[in-house]
């Protein structure tokens, strides 16, 4: 049986795969003392592919018949994955030089991006699982990248075991769906459900799949891996997990549930509301006593997943628009915060909140970016996070008023632990007065993330229009 393949629609994936193979070959043949350029080549390569995405936006359709859909939602999330890859590889070189094993990091980072891109276009169980496992396996390797560190090894082992368990749960759910429907295509499931209804076994399969996806987005109660892995992994990897991986996982989450189960929304929407409420509450409350900044940001990331889940409860395309907009501004703010943590940890070897005392005196730009990023995550106007939360919470007020109120309260709670960091950075005196010098790649990353966070807060319309255009296509 022949399969129709539209290679024009696969150009971004082909380019990323080619870049990964090129880097792999260069890592093998280039002497260690000459491998510094591999990091910069990775950033430039991913940036070039990202700049191609406006062209890709104009070309949509089924790339691989019945298995791989390239629509505007997929292109949007591929652009986010590439953007996360650009920023992470831009901030990683000096950090990886200090760890050692320099070039391998960039090879795995590129293949992680490829896994994300495959995942967000999947409309078939096989492509879904292929993309998910490519992304997961590369992140397992990256999480354990500090092989000489006990906490790094612990992070890798925990992620390996728990990711394996979650993948097994997801695969079992998918196998149940196949046994019940005799199809691997996500869209075909919707037609079968409409004609035949659902059975207890179907509900069980849905729960297994939901649990598997909930692990990937670190939703409560499947979040326990996140704090330990975020703290133990190299900081650029933590940034990548918190942004690119989370965005891609949310993309396939809502693609799966809204394509496969649109006619039985009432059976799963209440479960998602409960999941969102638990995730917001646990993430924010447990973040309060944290003393390690990376660990605090891990719980903050869990809470952010709860806010994003709220967008699933909207009854029209505004929920999709809100999810895409918020994931974009969350990605930018999170990259900004983790860039500061990466540089500071690389200079001082410290990542406790108290260790950032007086950062404003040592590096005003780092302090400003950290504060702007944290306040944006808290939803403080006029920053981008405020606009994002407005888009998320407003559509659900009518039908889910209690959840919108809870989300608002939890956002106010988050201000407390974010402001703790702000006070340490600006109020306390530093132990070391030595100014922190920044390489150009770091400096530009800091400036870009801060500028975009401020501009999108004041003028969110351009990004909101792009998200709305993609969301309306998806609803069709």
Swiss-Prot record:
<keyword id="KW-0813">Transport</keyword>
<keyword id="KW-0472">Membrane</keyword>
<feature type="transmembrane region" description="Helical">
    <location>
        <begin position="365"/>
        <end position="385"/>
    </location>
</feature>
<dbReference type="InterPro" id="IPR010096">
    <property type="entry name" value="NADH-Q_OxRdtase_suN/2"/>
</dbReference>
<feature type="transmembrane region" description="Helical">
    <location>
        <begin position="268"/>
        <end position="288"/>
    </location>
</feature>
<feature type="transmembrane region" description="Helical">
    <location>
        <begin position="126"/>
        <end position="146"/>
    </location>
</feature>
<dbReference type="GO" id="GO:0048038">
    <property type="term" value="F:quinone binding"/>
</dbReference>
<keyword id="KW-0520">NAD</keyword>
<feature type="transmembrane region" description="Helical">
    <location>
        <begin position="9"/>
        <end position="29"/>
    </location>
</feature>
<dbReference type="GO" id="GO:0008137">
    <property type="term" value="F:NADH dehydrogenase (ubiquinone) activity"/>
</dbReference>
<dbReference type="InterPro" id="IPR001750">
    <property type="entry name" value="ND/Mrp_TM"/>
</dbReference>
<dbReference type="GO" id="GO:0042773">
    <property type="term" value="P:ATP synthesis coupled electron transport"/>
</dbReference>
<keyword id="KW-0812">Transmembrane</keyword>
<feature type="transmembrane region" description="Helical">
    <location>
        <begin position="297"/>
        <end position="317"/>
    </location>
</feature>
<keyword id="KW-0874">Quinone</keyword>
<feature type="transmembrane region" description="Helical">
    <location>
        <begin position="37"/>
        <end position="57"/>
    </location>
</feature>
<comment type="subunit">
    <text>NDH-1 is composed of 14 different subunits. Subunits NuoA, H, J, K, L, M, N constitute the membrane sector of the complex.</text>
</comment>
<feature type="transmembrane region" description="Helical">
    <location>
        <begin position="244"/>
        <end position="264"/>
    </location>
</feature>
<feature type="transmembrane region" description="Helical">
    <location>
        <begin position="444"/>
        <end position="464"/>
    </location>
</feature>
<dbReference type="GO" id="GO:0050136">
    <property type="term" value="F:NADH:ubiquinone reductase (non-electrogenic) activity"/>
</dbReference>
<feature type="transmembrane region" description="Helical">
    <location>
        <begin position="105"/>
        <end position="125"/>
    </location>
</feature>
<dbReference type="Pfam" id="PF00361">
    <property type="entry name" value="Proton_antipo_M"/>
</dbReference>
<keyword id="KW-1133">Transmembrane helix</keyword>
<feature type="transmembrane region" description="Helical">
    <location>
        <begin position="402"/>
        <end position="424"/>
    </location>
</feature>
<feature type="transmembrane region" description="Helical">
    <location>
        <begin position="323"/>
        <end position="343"/>
    </location>
</feature>
<comment type="similarity">
    <text>Belongs to the complex I subunit 2 family.</text>
</comment>
<feature type="transmembrane region" description="Helical">
    <location>
        <begin position="160"/>
        <end position="180"/>
    </location>
</feature>
<protein>
    <recommendedName>
        <fullName>NADH-quinone oxidoreductase subunit N</fullName>
        <ecNumber>7.1.1.-</ecNumber>
    </recommendedName>
</protein>
<keyword id="KW-1003">Cell membrane</keyword>
<dbReference type="GO" id="GO:0005886">
    <property type="term" value="C:plasma membrane"/>
</dbReference>
<feature type="transmembrane region" description="Helical">
    <location>
        <begin position="73"/>
        <end position="93"/>
    </location>
</feature>
<feature type="transmembrane region" description="Helical">
    <location>
        <begin position="202"/>
        <end position="222"/>
    </location>
</feature>
<comment type="function">
    <text>NDH-1 shuttles electrons from NADH, via FMN and iron-sulfur (Fe-S) centers, to quinones in the respiratory chain. The immediate electron acceptor for the enzyme in this species is believed to be a menaquinone. Couples the redox reaction to proton translocation (for every two electrons transferred, four hydrogen ions are translocated across the cytoplasmic membrane), and thus conserves the redox energy in a proton gradient.</text>
</comment>
<keyword id="KW-1278">Translocase</keyword>
